[in-house]
């Protein structure tokens, strides 16, 4: 049985409450993006067993899920050994407008999967469409991009980021 104290230690509850009160669309976009990571990976794997061209869209969904993971959880860029080109690519998505356009392209790719066959990849397309819309609303409202406090660890993450070289040497 999982205790409430354990769950509170795993998630930054005070950060979640602060995020809800912020009324910032970029934070809501990040929350939906966390779901999109799960959707892309789960439905990508589930649809890879089709014997049609849907396999291509399944593989694309899995890759999209991994790219979203690195875009929405920037701490992973610090601890995973990645190429400078990939880090530069991911770092470009630092505004609401750029993220909205990125998600718009990704959802358009997944909507094209319907041409081949209607599958559960529609869930991925809908999720990416919602994320693109939320980020576009943030850009239209002129809101500054902010990172969510859900995954932060009350200051410990900031201390870890300063010791980036130590983490990379350990890996």
Swiss-Prot record:
Keyword Phosphoprotein: no
Topology within the bilayer: Multi-pass membrane protein
Main subcellular localisation: Golgi
Record-level GO cellular component terms: Golgi membrane
Assigned keywords, A-Z: Glycoprotein, Golgi apparatus, Membrane, Transmembrane, Transmembrane helix
Residues the record marks as carrying a glycan: 12, 24
Keyword Membrane: yes
Membrane spanning residue stretches: 25-45, 51-71, 96-115, 120-142
Compartments, record wording: Golgi apparatus membrane
A single GO BP: vesicle-mediated transport
Recorded family membership: Belongs to the TVP18 family.
Function recorded in the entry: Golgi membrane protein involved in vesicular trafficking.
Protein name, UniProt field: Golgi apparatus membrane protein TVP18
């Amino acid at each position: 049985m999982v205790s409430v104290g354990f769950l509170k230690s795993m998630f930054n509850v005070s950060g979640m409450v602060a995020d809800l009160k912020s009324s910032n669309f970029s934070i809501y976009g990040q929350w939906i993006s966390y779901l999109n990571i799960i959707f892309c990976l789960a439905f990508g794997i589930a649809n890879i067993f089709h014997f049609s061209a849907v396999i291509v869209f399944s593989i694309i969904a899995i890759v999209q899920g991994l790219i979203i993971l690195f875009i929405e959880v920037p701490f992973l860029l610090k601890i995973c050994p990645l190429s400078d080109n990939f880090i530069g690519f991911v770092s470009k998505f630092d505004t609401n407008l750029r993220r909205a356009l990125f998600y718009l392209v990704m959802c358009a790719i997944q909507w094209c999967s319907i041409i081949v066959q209607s599958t559960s990849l529609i869930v991925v397309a809908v999720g990416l469409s919602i994320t693109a819309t939320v980020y576009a609303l943030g850009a239209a409202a002129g809101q500054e991009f902010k990172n969510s406090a859900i995954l932060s660890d009350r200051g410990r993450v900031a201390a870890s980021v300063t010791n980036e070289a130590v983490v990379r040497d350990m890996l």
